[in-house]
């Protein structure tokens, strides 16, 4: 099948007959109310029910005969119809969908847009785009409804692409781009391509491109591709860019649902009612065939600003025929094949895990309400601060809204333990209420649905495979209600208002926590982890400036550049103390003049004084009785939208909870913050236990108890199995292979007396010394090169003396043209003096980190095909000598970059592969721009192994795609490039591929399975290549941590879990295939396990095999002599994507080279530049053919 399409065949029910390309074309015969069709969104053949007969081009043209109430038709570009329509539909034809010819025994539209009636009809009206319609007169819709109602005039099983009984893609009254009885692009109850909670191929509240309360590809109230109410990569959590509440139905990953019986939907819904005329009809791809809408006397329709309002009677529940769900090709994550691993292990250890079990009654119900708050000026966006103030006032003034029984997400959703009044409420603030003085708002609240906790328990028990994200979202908001009122909220984290650590320049750090809800084997778990973040102090602006700039007094302002002050203050929030108000203002800048020199035109609106010029000093004295002490400095501009509002600095105070970016921390403070964050496992354990019991924490207050939730204050305990380390293949000093059996708890090996598996031959190489003009302490010593050669030889490499040695200065790195010229001179000299030789390697000595490093890498690797190895003299030189460990690490990188291998597994076919198998490992990652960068592209990197069975050499492909797009575009083509690099002959292609995907959350699994993996399969299928593929996601950004319950063997205090600790019980998913593996040895801080999730497994690994495979691969990372935390295909993909970011920033620096010479612009400022490199410039990321299959990126 091609992207979910169906080819040929017969559809015997209300589903589909046919096939086609991209899942929307159908051929053959559909004998129910489905479709007959063929082509790309086009249809041919015969449809014998209420569906369509048809065919044509681009999926909206139809030919042939439609014998039901569907269409007969055909034509060009899907909007013209020819032939005969025998029902209430259309006979017609023409070009581009606006003219119709032929005969239809019902209402038929002729070419000119008029209506003719060649036969009897029980139907109503059908309209085409751009034609005149005859419609029943509009009737009044109740004020509480914001949606259109569907006309009674449209016949059952209405033609068009819309309606219940619809054969299109959408929901009630809407299919494709149409509405009720509408063949145009808009209609009643129509929102673009959206149906009732259904978008694209989704169902009610499904994850298509949007739904009721859904924006993106995800679940309830979600924006992006993630989980419940989450915008980034998270699960249940934050609301992001937009959210319109929850829609009806269960939420999964866009697959078929087992639908409950129809239920009544409240008449107070903001949606329109469904016409009685829509009681019957068939369903093709759309709403009911996937996720039936629940309704009885009325139902909800999506909002549409373009809909015409037409009233009608409503259909009774008995008239609604819910068809059987259609089959779906959508893949779901594979289920766990066994009860977990039981492989031979070093031992079993008892662990505490920072998961706290949440108990609840399955009889409990959480009521979900949609909130819409409107101000007097409907076009003005209402801030979250205003939303909170309005909600609080209404709940305070109206006893029917109990605060203690509700949780508010700060935007559109309220969850309640009791029933709340619905409707429209006026909220007026009096003139004495300073912040919101005299403002009026309308608070509209409507019940969306009742969230049954029984649905969540059914999922946890495995009785349902569709995660109720709406229930999880409601519970998550409830859990966060109490801490959000008492702590500083930063995304999904909560921090104390007290800064416990003082960095000394107006900045300190506060402790906090992050928590998420996770369905697990043991039930619902609250995962709680400690956190630390730097904030500006909530002090006066003048005091802050004195601390930040190190001034003894404010008079030193004159010695500072105003731009430096503006750069630090702009965008910060302040309150003022010259009047009684809690209102927050944003600093927009400084006044050009000092306070004493600012005058303005004063107009007394009460008419007591004539207009006059007045100074700021006089005004504050007269108006507020306040003298200004610091008149010789500028005022702050707190105005907005071009209106200046100057306020003396001494009256302004910084609002608490304003983050200080860690990249702006002084070096000592940054190191201190990092050190504080890297707490020992014992310290982290104690911090978390304090937080779970804190009155400010997630268990604090009465709110969760009022919803019937209880959080166990004790951590979950589990058993961890410690896997045995693999035996490694190294060499002795003579180059003979040896087997290294690792016995230590850390699983590290030592190369002091041993060598790498395959040492490279480096005969022609060069040295570029950028430290030649530096002081003696920073300069590369003359002995360094000889020491490096000696260490490389000790590891089994054959390295001769360099054939080219050139000196330069760090200043050269500022000039891209000069740098390229220098590198070309190295190539020319080597070629000229050594018989056309090209340097295998260029060693570059630098004094410290420099943006010119990016330019050097970009030029060398994309333009010239040079492998470079940079090093910092300040790191390499310790006293009068160079560190042997540093030289060894440098040598390992060099060996890998030029084609050698550093370590190999003895059991490199992992015993569970067959001897005839050819296996390839692929890793994929997407590198996104910094948070403040709204322009730069995301960088994709895909890496793949080049050798089997060693599987320790990789090639990488790097490219750019749309800003912050996580879905890898052209994933199949990129993987195919790597397949070709792996094996030139078809018979040598791998028959088994394991793809490791990094950087995706649970809510993006659908994207990986049904978009990225499908794209790979489609590309492979075109060349007749059909390997077995297993897809595994590696998740790093989670909060789960393990704490050993006993001391280690050597008797030291409680530390990290041993390398190889795996957990695949209790805290994992109830039935899907995941586990936690802590492969690394944690020497600093608390080890973070990697969460591995098997999404698809055609190879058929059991738990023992997949755990051993991943753990063993972690020993093959080329840069170190210990197992790494993340499986190498993912680690390499991450490094290659970072290298792509380096290329992009180097290209921007070149484009922005008009900036003052010597100013080292940060990548952030460059990336935000208006002169952003276009996405079409693919050459930026195209690695030179000479090195693209080498590991240049390590």
Curated annotation (Swiss-Prot):
Domain PAZ, first and last residues per copy: 540-656
Residue stretches of biased makeup (Gly residues): 181-214, 229-238
One GO CC annotation: ribonucleoprotein complex
Gene3D superfamilies attached to this UniProt entry: 3.40.50.2300, paz domain (2.170.260.10), Ribonuclease H-like superfamily/Ribonuclease H (3.30.420.10)
Classification via SUPFAM superfamilies: PAZ domain (SSF101690), Ribonuclease H-like (SSF53098)
Biased composition (Polar residues): 317-326
Keywords: Plant defense, Repressor, Ribonucleoprotein, RNA-binding, RNA-mediated gene silencing, Transcription, Transcription regulation, Translation regulation
CDD domains reported for this sequence: PAZ_argonaute_like, Piwi_ago-like
Example GO biological process: defense response to virus
Sequence ranges of Low complexity compositional bias: 142-158, 256-277, 299-316
InterPro entries xrefs: ArgoL1, ArgoL2, Argonaute_N, PAZ_dom, PAZ_dom_sf, Piwi, Piwi_ago-like, RNaseH-like_sf
Region: Disordered, residue numbers: 1-277, 299-341
Known role: Involved in RNA-mediated post-transcriptional gene silencing (PTGS). Main component of the RNA-induced silencing complex (RISC) that binds to a short guide RNA such as a microRNA (miRNA) or small interfering RNA (siRNA). RISC uses the mature miRNA or siRNA as a guide for slicer-directed cleavage of homologous mRNAs to repress gene expression.
Protein family per UniProt: Belongs to the argonaute family. Ago subfamily.
Protein name: Protein argonaute 3
Organism this protein belongs to: Arabidopsis thaliana (Mouse-ear cress)
Gene that specifies this protein: AGO3
